Amino acid sequence: MPNTPSPLALTQGLIRCPSVTPAEGGALSLLADLLGAAGFSVERPVFSEPGTPDVENLYARIGTAGPCLLLAGHTDVVPPGDLAAWRHDPFGGVVEEGEVHGRGAVDMKGGIACLAAAILAFLAERGPDFGGSIAFLITGDEEGPAVNGTVKLLAWARQKGERFDHCILAEPTNPDRLGDMIKIGRRGSLTAALTVHGVQGHVAYPHRAENPIPGLIRLAGALLAAPLDAGTAHFDASNLEFTTVDVGNPASNVIPAEARAVFNIRFNDLWTPATLEAELRRRLDAAAGNAVRYTLAVQPTNAVAFLTQPDPFVDLVTAAIEAETGRRPALSTTGGTSDARFIKDACPVIEFGLVGQTMHQIDERAALADLDRLTAIFRRVLDAYFPGDAALQKRA
């Protein structure tokens, strides 16, 4: 079998590309060269949106037959922050004490490197006629606004007639150890601003003013008085958290004209953004009556709750993880949002990658042993998926 690059070498190569969102930084070029040499057709569409930076993306595919396994991720990273606080250059890919250091080592250049290493080894052994197709969908706009990335790349692929049967998104899903957790869904996210309107005045003459602060407290209490729900089989209860409260008033002898609070709700699959907003307004109207004047501004959101039902594909990935780590992963929907919220409209999607303890932190790093094990897990998935269990092939 020809030599194929190691997951460490690929991780280091990607880390050394300074792809702070939305910069491409050479990361997509590295992958394009690698995949092109392995026989993939590679395209690099650039998407635009007024008020946001143009973003370059990558789509690569090998094979035309079904089933098609989609492998997804992002090469953009968050800024490194204070460079002096890092033990090593955040774009150096330095190895120390069994770990590779650098921005994106965990989130998620290491995961992409493991996918690529597994696929290259798979193709080197099996050749291009492996009984299906493999597609790579990589964006440079996940850590940023996420408007010129995966969502548009999927629409672009759909217009080209591309179809996918299942997807693995290599996000760092494991809390503590490799093999802890597969994400089979994500909670939705809704942010809103609640403003209570009053009348500004002197504190010594409250009868000439209308203090909005008691009204804000009253309405906030109404939102928090009862749980939104009790959770579902695969989701925790929906949760509302106030994140800012402000009256815009530096003077201690002035009653403010308005009081404003912002809150975020992470919600489960019992709700949609529309039904959740309706429930919020019902509670607020009941509490406000004719005594409190308020406005509620809900931010548009594309982060809806979704669930990939456990099925033979989830079982296949679970078995591969258990075979390599000895751990049976939990099937979870916890955590924040990811690009899986877009992919779920194209095909069933699960997320599995490295241990996420240091993602977005100073001295972000990944264990070399985990890179090897994750690559072995992905290789097991490929071997089982092609030709795969007959139950999986029904969608092809």
UniProtKB/Swiss-Prot annotation:
Zn(2+) 2 binds at D107, E143, H360. Its EC number is 3.5.1.18. Binds 2 Zn(2+) or Co(2+) ions per subunit. GO terms for molecular function: acetylornithine deacetylase activity; cobalt ion binding; succinyl-diaminopimelate desuccinylase activity; zinc ion binding. SUPFAM superfamilies: Bacterial exopeptidase dimerisation domain, Zn-dependent exopeptidases. Keywords: Amino-acid biosynthesis, Cobalt, Diaminopimelate biosynthesis, Hydrolase, Lysine biosynthesis, Metal-binding, Zinc. Pfam families: M20_dimer, Peptidase_M20. Zn(2+) 1 binds at H74, D107, E171. The keyword Ribonucleoprotein does not apply. The active site is at D76, E142 (proton acceptor). It is an enzyme of class 3 (hydrolase). InterPro entries: ArgE/DapE_CS, Bact_exopeptidase_dim_dom, DapE_proteobac, Peptidase_M20, Peptidase_M20_dimer, Peptidase_M20A. It catalyses: N-succinyl-(2S,6S)-2,6-diaminopimelate + H2O = (2S,6S)-2,6-diaminopimelate + succinate. CDD domains: M20_DapE_proteobac. Homodimer. PANTHER family: ACETYLORNITHINE DEACETYLASE, N-ACETYL-L-CITRULLINE DEACETYLASE. Catalyzes the hydrolysis of N-succinyl-L,L-diaminopimelic acid (SDAP), forming succinate and LL-2,6-diaminopimelate (DAP), an intermediate involved in the bacterial biosynthesis of lysine and meso-diaminopimelic acid, an essential component of bacterial cell walls. This is Succinyl-diaminopimelate desuccinylase. The gene is dapE.
